[in-house]
């Protein structure tokens, strides 16, 4: 089985294109497995500044077809031209897939380097794929190893020790822009009830903010504030809350964005400045709100440009952990890939031995001599299999496991069966209730 990934991030393309690509991302994995025979597994990682698709296919010969199938699906779901979609994604294969995901999960590839929110997003991406039955066994191992690597980086280095995140940097920027930097006096309206909104609520509380209202176009605000505090808003109470707000923060990414004309009308008699923080990749606020008098607009691009740099020592230590973990994972995966071939060779050889022993017993009976012959033959077979087994491990370590499998098929006619591609959700030990609460 071959792993690959399609990667579109803030580092390579503008965030507007990332946002457009990610439209329909929740449907991609299932659609790809349904419509394509060459994509045997898929996990989608979509965050505020990246859209990545991790896939698995049976062999390297199917790789281009699998990529094309995913590009076609993304084009259909997003409404973007297929050529534009193809150009927007970098394709990773081989060890680069592992190294990239491990770095992403550890926060090394984030707009705010060292931020910890991404580790949870990587974990939730796997859980979602497991629920939908699109996570192949190889992808499950990859994402679980990435999560473990992120934990190791957090435990063994000072990377992220300042607790920086996209939300915290955005709030720091808002503090710098505000005439009054005291959050205890501010009225805040939060749009959204997902994981980002939850992180925003927590950080606002840490800064002393108590007057927080929450709006959800899907009607989830009541349940959200029931466990986190704050005031739930609906369509009727939202305008008054926005009119009185000092800060409004967009975390939902819904289709119901706040238009500049509507905001101007609602705040016509406000008489005080407003800071609008748009953390949604697909924009909760019309970009034109930043042109309104008395309104300062902060976006993900603002956060990226303002993000402080981590210390070189922490980055070096974290990178070493990521590289070591990626190398170990690849070595284990390559060794594992020949296990089925080794088992197939042993089964083939033992079947031949058993067939010959049946002939011996049929001719001579179950005598002591027959038992001695069988014992000698089994010992000889074990010795004969030793070198092919050792060579299999050596070839796998050098990435030549396919050569070994091809040799078995050419010399002995042994067909090596690939392991089952997909891991159904019902067989995966995931906490589905926790997932639902985090994505609400």
Swiss-Prot record:
Site annotation Important for activity: residues: 100
EC category name: oxidoreductase
Domain of life: Bacteria
Record-level GO BP terms: protoporphyrinogen IX biosynthetic process from glutamate
Catalysed reactions listed for this entry: (S)-4-amino-5-oxopentanoate + tRNA(Glu) + NADP(+) = L-glutamyl-tRNA(Glu) + NADPH + H(+)
Binding annotation for substrate: 47-50, 110, 115-117, 121
E.C. number(s) listed in UniProt: 1.2.1.70
Active-site feature positions: 48 (nucleophile)
GO molecular function per UniProt: glutamyl-tRNA reductase activity; NADP binding
Keyword Electron transport listed: no
Note: During catalysis, the active site Cys acts as a nucleophile attacking the alpha-carbonyl group of tRNA-bound glutamate with the formation of a thioester intermediate between enzyme and glutamate, and the concomitant release of tRNA(Glu). The thioester intermediate is finally reduced by direct hydride transfer from NADPH, to form the product GSA.
PANTHER family, A to Z: GLUTAMYL-TRNA REDUCTASE (PTHR43013:SF1)
Assembly: Homodimer.
Protein name: Glutamyl-tRNA reductase
Organism in which the protein naturally occurs: Paenarthrobacter aurescens (strain TC1)
């Amino acid at each position: 089985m071959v792993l690959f990934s399609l990667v579109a991030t803030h580092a390579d393309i503008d965030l507007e294109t990332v946002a457009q690509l990610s439209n329909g991302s929740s449907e991609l994995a299932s659609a790809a497995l349904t419509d394509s025979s060459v994509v045997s597994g898929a996990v989608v990682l979509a965050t505020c500044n990246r859209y990545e698709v991790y896939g698995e296919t049976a062999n390297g010969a199917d790789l281009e077809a699998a990529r094309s199938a995913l590009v076609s699906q993304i084009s259909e779901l997003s409404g973007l031209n297929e050529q534009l979609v193809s150009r927007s994604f970098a394709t990773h294969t081989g060890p680069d897939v592992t190294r990239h995901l491990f770095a992403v999960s550890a926060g090394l590839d984030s707009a705010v380097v060292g931020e910890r929110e991404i580790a949870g997003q990587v974990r939730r991406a796997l859980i979602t794929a497991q629920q939908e039955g699109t996570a192949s066994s190889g992808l499950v191992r990859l994402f679980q190893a990435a999560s473990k690597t992120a934990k190791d980086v957090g435990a063994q280095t000072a990377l992220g020790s300042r607790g920086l995140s996209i939300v915290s940097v955005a709030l720091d920027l808002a503090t710098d822009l505000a005439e009054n930097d005291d959050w205890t006096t501010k009225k805040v309206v939060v749009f959204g009830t997902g994981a980002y909104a939850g992180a925003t609520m927590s950080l606002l509380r840490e800064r002393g903010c108590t007057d927080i209202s929450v709006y959800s176009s899907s009607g989830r605000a009541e349940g959200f504030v029931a466990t986190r505090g704050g005031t739930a808003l609906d369509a009727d109470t939202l305008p008054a809350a926005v009119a009185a707000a000092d800060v409004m923060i967009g975390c939902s990414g819904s289709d119901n964005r706040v238009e500049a004309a509507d905001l101007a009308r609602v705040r016509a008699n406000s008489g005080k400045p407003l800071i609008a923080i748009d953390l949604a990749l697909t924009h909760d606020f019309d970009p034109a709100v930043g042109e309104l008098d008395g309104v300062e607009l902060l976006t993900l691009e603002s956060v990226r440009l303002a993000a402080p740099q981590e210390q070189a020592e922490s980055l070096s230590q974290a990178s070493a952990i990521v590289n070591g973990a990626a190398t170990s994972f690849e070595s284990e995966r390559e060794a594992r890939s020949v296990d089925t071939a080794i088992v197939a060779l042993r089964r083939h050889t033992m079947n031949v031995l058993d067939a010959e022993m049946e002939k011996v017993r049929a001719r001579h009976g179950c005598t002591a001599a027959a038992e001695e012959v069988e014992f000698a033959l089994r010992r000889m077979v074990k010795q004969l299999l030793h070198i092919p087994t050792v060579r299999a491990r050596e070839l796998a370590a050098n990435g030549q496991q396919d050569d070994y499998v091809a040799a078995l098929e050419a010399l002995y006619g042994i067909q090596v069966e690939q392991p089952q591609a997909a891991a159904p959700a019902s067989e995966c030990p995931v906490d589905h209730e926790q997932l639902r609460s985090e994505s609400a």
